Amino acid sequence: EMVDYYVGIGANGLEMDVSFDSNGKAEYTYHGVPCDCFRSCTRSEKFSVYLDYVRQITTPGNPKFRENLIFLIMDLKLNDLEPHALYNAGIDIADQLSKNYWKDDGKARAHFLISIPYVSQTAFVDGFRWWFEKKGLEKYYEKIGWDFSANEDLNSIQATYQKLNITGHTWQSDGITNCLTRGTERLTQAIQKRDTPGNSYLNKVYAWSLDKYGSIKQALDLGVDGVMSNYPQRMVEILSEGTYLERFRLATYEDNPWETFKQ
């Protein structure tokens, strides 16, 4: 229901909040309290069911196919998990993607950004990659990108990617719940890092959750690659006017989400 609603009003990407049991099994797409203002925080769906539904609407030829939905962000709720459970969570997400999203041999075409809160939670990445390689899923790495979402020091995030030997397919988020206002200092720093010659660890920058017209425009003026909003129709409206119409457009499937765009 919510997927159809947001895609219907113009969203080309969706965020799913993924909750886990204590062993690292992904259970529900669910946020819980607190969440963004003016949103229902308590809706939930089984993770496997959600993945299967977005598979259908991102598969060309499926009766439910929606051409504009091209990008899915998994906001992983990992903060209560012990290291062994983080590793298991990585295995489980990789396994569920292969069974519930790519089960038609990869005909479903969306790209996934896997958003991990903290750099201390890299056991998740280890588990995910181990399962990919064990099961021969390497061809799907092209569909996977990475993000650390807890607004940590950008140099620490860069060092973590180096340690993990990740040199591409990375987005950097910066943001806070729409209930609060946040300065743009770190967001600006991330954009500067993205645009530094020789940078190989940061491809794209996005801001969240921006719902006011002025906040969305400010982020675009700074040069972000994406905006997460509870009101995607406002972004569509902004991009249809003035200088924004000249400088920006909504991404389509033909665009590479891992390629740094030079303005």
Curated annotation (Swiss-Prot):
Gene Ontology annotations of biological process type: killing of cells of another organism; lipid catabolic process
Location of the protein in the cell: Secreted
Domain of life where this protein originates: Eukaryota
Top-level EC class: lyase
EC number, UniProt record: 4.6.1.-
Keywords, alphabetical: Cytolysis, Dermonecrotic toxin, Disulfide bond, Hemolysis, Lipid degradation, Lipid metabolism, Lyase, Magnesium, Metal-binding, Secreted, Toxin
Reaction catalysis annotation: an N-(acyl)-sphingosylphosphocholine = an N-(acyl)-sphingosyl-1,3-cyclic phosphate + choline; an N-(acyl)-sphingosylphosphoethanolamine = an N-(acyl)-sphingosyl-1,3-cyclic phosphate + ethanolamine; a 1-acyl-sn-glycero-3-phosphocholine = a 1-acyl-sn-glycero-2,3-cyclic phosphate + choline; a 1-acyl-sn-glycero-3-phosphoethanolamine = a 1-acyl-sn-glycero-2,3-cyclic phosphate + ethanolamine
GO cellular component, one term: extracellular region
Cofactor list: Mg(2+)
Entry note: cofactor: Binds 1 Mg(2+) ion per subunit.
Annotated disulfide bonds: 35-41, 37-179
GO MF annotation list: lyase activity; metal ion binding; phosphoric diester hydrolase activity; toxin activity
InterPro entries linked to this entry: PLC-like_Pdiesterase_TIM-brl (IPR017946)
Tissues/organs with expression: Expressed by the venom gland.
Ranges in coiled-coil conformation: none
Main location: secreted
Binding site for Mg(2+): 15, 17, 75
Catalytic center residues: 31 (nucleophile)
Function: Dermonecrotic toxins cleave the phosphodiester linkage between the phosphate and headgroup of certain phospholipids (sphingolipid and lysolipid substrates), forming an alcohol (often choline) and a cyclic phosphate. This toxin acts on sphingomyelin (SM). It may also act on ceramide phosphoethanolamine (CPE), lysophosphatidylcholine (LPC) and lysophosphatidylethanolamine (LPE), but not on lysophosphatidylserine (LPS), and lysophosphatidylglycerol (LPG). It acts by transphosphatidylation, releasing exclusively cyclic phosphate products as second products.
Stated family: Belongs to the arthropod phospholipase D family. Class II subfamily.
UniProt name for this protein: Dermonecrotic toxin SpaSicTox-betaIF1
Source species taxonomy: Eukaryota, Metazoa, Ecdysozoa, Arthropoda, Chelicerata
